[in-house]
Amino acid sequence: MKATVALIPQTFLVFSASLAPLLAQTPSTQQQQPEFVRQGQQLMREGKLDDALVLYRKTLQTSPYSVPANIAAGSVLDLMGQGEEARKYFAKAIDVADTPERKAMAQRAMSMSYAFEGNCKKTVEYEQHVFDYYGSVRNFFQQGEIADEAARTCIDSGDLDTAYHWYQVGHDTGLKEPEIKPPRQDLWEFRWEHAQARIAARRGNQADAQKHVTTAKKILDKGTNPEQAQFLPYLQGYVAFYAGNYKTALEELLKANQNDPFIQCMIGQTHEKLGDKDKAIEFYHKASTAIAHNPPAAYAVPLAKKKIASLPS
C-alpha cells in the first residue's frame, strides 16, 4: 500500500463502517433508512444473523444493484465466518457503485472482509483505493482515518512494521487538514502516541511503550478531546498485558469501553492468562456476538469463536 496523497474511525457502527455513510446523509437518518436496513439491524441485535441474511438476499432479488444491500449481505457473511462468499457481494457493490464515493465505501467493506481473516496485505490493498478517493476530494481527515483503519488491522494481525507505517501516514495526512484547529491536532498526536505505545509493547520494548503512554496522557490532560479518555485505560491495559502484568491489565481494561468487542476479547485473554477459564469464556461469548463490520469486530469475533471452541466449558 503506497501513500499517495493528492484509521479508528473509533466508532462502533451497527453492522458496517462502510455502509453507514450511505445511510447518514442528513440528521433525519433514522426516518430515511430503507426498511430492510432497519429490519436487518434489529435482527442482528437479536443475534439472528441467518434471518438478516435472508432479508438482505430477498432485497437483492428485487434490487440486485443496491449497494447498501450488497454491503449488508456481505457484512453478515463475514460475521458468520464466510469471507469468500461475503466478498462476492462486496465485489458486486464495487462493480455497480454509481459514484466514486459509493465505490470507495464498497472497497472499504471489502478491506474489512479481509480484516476478518487477519489478512493485512489484502486489507491494505483495498484501503489504498479508499485512501486515494479521499485524497482526490482533499478530505485529509478521512484519509487519516482510513490509514489508521488499515494500520489497526495490521497490528492486530501481527504485521507491526506495516502497522507502524500506516499509523504514521494517518498522523501525517490528518495534520494536512487546512486551517486545522488545535483540538484536531491533539487528536492526531494522541492517536499516534497511542499507536506507538501499542507497537512498542508488542515488540517487547516496555520502556518505549511507557514513554508513549505518558505522552498520550499528557495530551489527554489538555482536555481538548475528552471523548478520547476511554482509550487511555485501553492503552494502559494493552501495554500491561504484553508486559505480562495481567492483574494490572485486567484492572485497566475493566475501565475501558465494555461494549467494545476488542476490549471484551482482551479481558477474556487476560482472565485466561490468570487461570480463570470461566470468566474468560464469559467475555469471549460477549465478543463473539459483535455485529459491527470494523477492525475491533474483525479481530474479536473470529478469535472469540475459536477460544470458545477450544476452551473446556
Map each language-model feature to its residues.
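Alpha-helical segment of the N-proximal tetratricopeptide repeat
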Residues: Q32-K58, T62, V239
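Register position in tetratricopeptide repeats
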Residues: R45-E46, L79-M80, F116, E149, ...
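Start-of-helix register in tetratricopeptide repeats
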Residues: P34, P68, R102-M105, E145, ...
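Canonical tetratricopeptide repeat
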Residues: A72, M105-A109, Q142, E149, ...
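Residue-level recognition of tetratricopeptide repeat
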Residues: Q41, S75, M112, R152, ...
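Short coil turns that delineate tetratricopeptide repeat
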Residues: Q30, P64, D98-E101, G135, ...
